[in-house]
Amino acid sequence: STLLASSAASDVYKRQALGISLNQVFDKESVYIHIMHGDITTRTGVDSQNIVSKVGNEVKAYAAANHYKATDFKQIIHIVDTDAAYLSDDKILEDLACMELSYQDDGIHTNNVGKVVDRNKQKTDNLYRLRGCGNIWNIPYRVYYMSCNLDHVLYDKRNSTDEEKENDAYAFAKKYKDNVNAFLEYMCESSFSVKGDFKDSWQFIEKDMHSIERHTNLPICLLEEIKDKES
């Protein structure tokens, strides 16, 4: 089985949007979508020293709750939002009218610059550790990004309300429900699709303004699965 772990906000909509299509891509084995509440990479007390064990604990808790053991899993695919975390500090822009973070072409708008600087440091340190980690709980593990978040990649919207997320997820799931080829074409052949080498794909997202732009390296995972199926 493939365990898809998603750590980001408005999680139920993410399950709805991606779940049906991914189940069709990975149809030889079941896909279990486990939603981590909130973003584990920015959780209080989580740092590069303990992030791997924290993700491992999530996987173990999920397995225990569903009566699985480590050998029941083929792989763990962890999908994270970049949340523009790789932007330089001068792209974190003070806007006292911003009650919530706002992701714009020129940077992150916030009423608390220091807090965002700290969050970005924590998130990028943790992602650096995770992307170099090949196994968690003896299960092959890889982390893939959605930039600047899942809504941005799937629907080209950066700052969606919960209502928009719900509506967009429903429409997306409906559109690709019985059309896995169209889903794969959209994810793997769009201007936002980052393909090729896994390590290179992370070096790409670190650069310039890329982590606030529309990019995902999930196609690397999808194309590998298709290749496996064909062999």
Where are these regions (language model features)?
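C-terminal accessory helical subdomains adjacent to catalytic cores in phosphodiester-
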Residues: 17-49, 56-231
